[in-house]
Amino acid sequence: TGRSDDRQPVDAIVVLGAAQYDGRPSPQFQARLDHALELWKLDLASYIVVTGGKQVGDRFTEAAAARKFFETKGVKDNLIFEENLGKTTYASLLAVSRVASERKIERVLIVSDPFHQLRAKLIAQEVGLDAITSATRSSVIRGGDAFQRNLQEAAGVAVGRIVGFQRVDSWTN
């Protein structure tokens, strides 16, 4: 996973949320949205699922900011599903699994940053999603920050594989 790109036809593209500022995606989130739109234009999925809640003081959820982006790019409202409560990857993907079950979505393509892909895929499997991944081509997170994120993700994957990602999520939130 990581820098791999497993893109192939699926039922839905799932865009994992990231920071947004008053409805405007952060550069990291924008890279995810742009990549998902590129995949959408390749006709790889019928639906887009946008994820992410909001932090204290926010007026908009990450999912609402993502929906607005896709609507301005011509994706029809009825083809976008919103998961707007999750504040963690685990919570968002657990909610996506419920949406997928309700909407008869069998296979999803998860879009996130390269360093985040393996953990996202493993969490998706734990919550019952049939998932493949497609990472953004590059991350706006570079240098020391990228190194730190990769270490955090590696630790998260290791611990999650041992005790389960649900337990890790409950410890950290």
Task: Label every PLM stretch briefly.
Residues A146-S170:
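A transmembrane-helix-recognition feature enriched in membrane-embedded lipid enzymes
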Residues G2-L151:
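A structural signal for short, hydrophobic/glycine-enriched beta-strand patches
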Residues T1, S170-N173:
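N-terminal secretory targeting signals
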